[in-house]
């Protein structure tokens, strides 16, 4: 049976921390779907399409990676695409508390889907998309925090006057 996992997130934008988790999860599964949450209640810097394109570009070196977008409940999406594992990266104990609650609710809604927690590499334990956007907004270098393609996309966005 084919093992399909989902790495879900907003990815606004994808960071080296996200990429680290995806790269480390890739050899464990036959296929990984990097699933971009289309959350209409948020005002993202990058559109869903832009985020999907950036993720595709920075994961092109990895076999068996697909990029998709979803709305609604993650467990419903997982069932739709035939995934039986949700991969979540954890930076700190504070992440674990929230993620454990979400995993428990997901398990209650669909007991066929497991959640796999992976600890982030120490060098990315402080990293978030919000921190990256805040730094980039004020012209600080985000080299080493995001892949070069994302760094360029951020530079382009903020040179156009996007100040979210």
Swiss-Prot record:
Its cofactor is Mg(2+). The record marks 18 as: Transition state stabilizer. GO terms for cellular component: cytoplasm. Substrate binds at residues 10, 42, 74, 88. Pathway: Cofactor biosynthesis; coenzyme A biosynthesis; CoA from (R)-pantothenate: step 4/5. Pfam families: CTP_transf_like. ATP binds at residues 10-11, 18, 89-91, 99, 124-130. Its main location: cytoplasm. CDD domains: PPAT. Keywords: ATP-binding, Coenzyme A biosynthesis, Cytoplasm, Magnesium, Nucleotide-binding, Nucleotidyltransferase, Transferase. The keyword Transferase applies. It comes from the Bacteria. The keyword ATP-binding applies. Its EC number is 2.7.7.3. It catalyses: (R)-4'-phosphopantetheine + ATP + H(+) = 3'-dephospho-CoA + diphosphate. SUPFAM superfamilies: Nucleotidylyl transferase. One of its GO terms (biological process) is coenzyme A biosynthetic process. GO terms for molecular function: ATP binding; pantetheine-phosphate adenylyltransferase activity. It is found in: Cytoplasm. Homohexamer. Belongs to the bacterial CoaD family. Reversibly transfers an adenylyl group from ATP to 4'-phosphopantetheine, yielding dephospho-CoA (dPCoA) and pyrophosphate. NCBIfam families: coaD_prev_kdtB (TIGR01510), cyt_tran_rel (TIGR00125). This is Phosphopantetheine adenylyltransferase. It comes from Exiguobacterium sibiricum (strain DSM 17290 / CCUG 55495 / CIP 109462 / JCM 13490 / 255-15). The lineage of its organism: Bacteria, Bacillati, Bacillota, Bacilli, Bacillales.
